[in-house]
Amino acid sequence: MKNRLLIMILLLLPMVAMSQVDTGARKRVMEEYRQQYRQQFNEYKDSISGQFIQYLKQRWDEKQLFQGEHQPVRPEPVLQPESDTLSDTLHSEQLPTGDMVTLQVEQFQPTTTDKVATYVAEVFNIAFYGKQLTFKVPVNVSKIKLSGSREYQISNYWQQLNKEKLNQVTLQLAGQKQELRLNGWGLFDLTRQLTASIYPNNADQQVALAVYLLNAMHYDVRMGCVGGNLVILMASASKIYDIPFTVVSNVRYYAFRPIGAKEELKGRLYTYSQQLDGANHGIDLFMSETPQLGGRLCSNPYKNRFGGRDITIYVNQGLMDFYAQYPQMELKMYANAAIDEVFYLALERNIKPLIEGKNTYRAVSTLLQYVQEGFGYQVDNLQFGREKNFFCEENFYYPANDCEDRALLFSYLVRMFVGVDVVLLEYADHVAAAVCFPKEAKVKGDYYLYRNNQYVVCDPTCKGAKVGQVSNKYKKQSPKIIQTA
């Protein structure tokens, strides 16, 4: 019952913070939360010092370590396709559809800021993607030594941690999560960076401390051991590509080494099956809001000229660095991600004037042409040596993009500045988009029927392709339809 009450309070905190409630009511909610959190952390410490510490000492189970699911590689053309092979005559034809892909996200807010209690602390300064952060950690924590990666050694280390005021550290971490608007992955990354700062020369100790802290914030992470090295096993509802994983109790756990570790994970994996009480929330990777990571803009802005206008757009360098290390996910996760507020204003200032005064069809046509002509084209394997989906802002940072990035960018521009619905069309070797025009627009062209509405095909990659034009090879395919927010 206590656990449920705490989680309900935690889930309500973001709404409380954003709503226009009176100060007195907000203080009462916060104080109730703080009392519950302190009590819950004490219960967490009790559970560790009791049965769970003893459980960690037992021999860990051997689990199969899968070598990561590779991100699908689309056999895209090396050169940007052009519309020479498309017919100039547009006919309205309903095309066959495949699966419908929607995004369902469970978000979890672990804690909020609290007044840090007085205690003897060691100060650690972290440069977190353009933000300078300071953490106060109980002075004894950095002195506690993990003597090895055996079960009893880890158990003894956790028992020593349990004597320290680490609830003050989790409060600081959770406070930064709120302040910087981090999602679960952002907090996971920040926790790893903090533990790397505390134990710069002991990778195993970084893992053991990170798992302790994340468990205390109710996240479902575990320790594993591969080839004598500890790893963090992170539960996530989102599919992550190219990261080794194991399965425990039908839950997929992705294996992460400490930051900076170079060793490839090889060998048998050993871990424990029992879940620590209350640590049952997977790490969410969905970007429901954009992290606030410093104000430094990149030194090399996107510049172009289109429609008689000079277009210059800067993006946040810290955000680009954050996205550069972000795990690769399914396309639907990018298609529905939030965008940076400053970046949105730059788009509004530079792109929106291109379509002012135009009807829906002409506005969509202009944006389609802009995306077709306004960016260099290069497939991911040539630009990065691997597959890489872009968040929207990354299109204005890297020198080139490919089909899925263009389709995603086009969908954002149409939704933001034209105000009509867009879906993505994921073919076996290509990604395009489709726009739901108002019925009175009477737009001709190939379309898909989705939720009883016609979505007219738009291909932002094929240079010169008009609204409603699609290559004959794709008319015979049934793409996945990815819903956008």
Tell where the protein language model's regions lie, with residue ranges.
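Long, contiguous, compositionally biased segments that the model treats as domain-scale units
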Residues: 27, 31-213
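Hydrophobic/aromatic-rich core segments of domains that either
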Residues: 221-250, 355-358, 405-485
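Extended, non-transmembrane interaction/recognition domains
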Residues: 205-352
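Active-site neighborhood of thiol-dependent amide/isopeptide-bond enzymes
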Residues: 197-210, 219, 378-438
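Cleaved targeting-peptide boundary
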Residues: 19-28
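Hydrophobic h-region of N-terminal signal peptides that target proteins for export
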Residues: 10-18
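Sec-dependent signal peptide recognition
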Residues: 2-10
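Secondary-structure boundary elements
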Residues: 139-143, 147-191, 333-398, 461
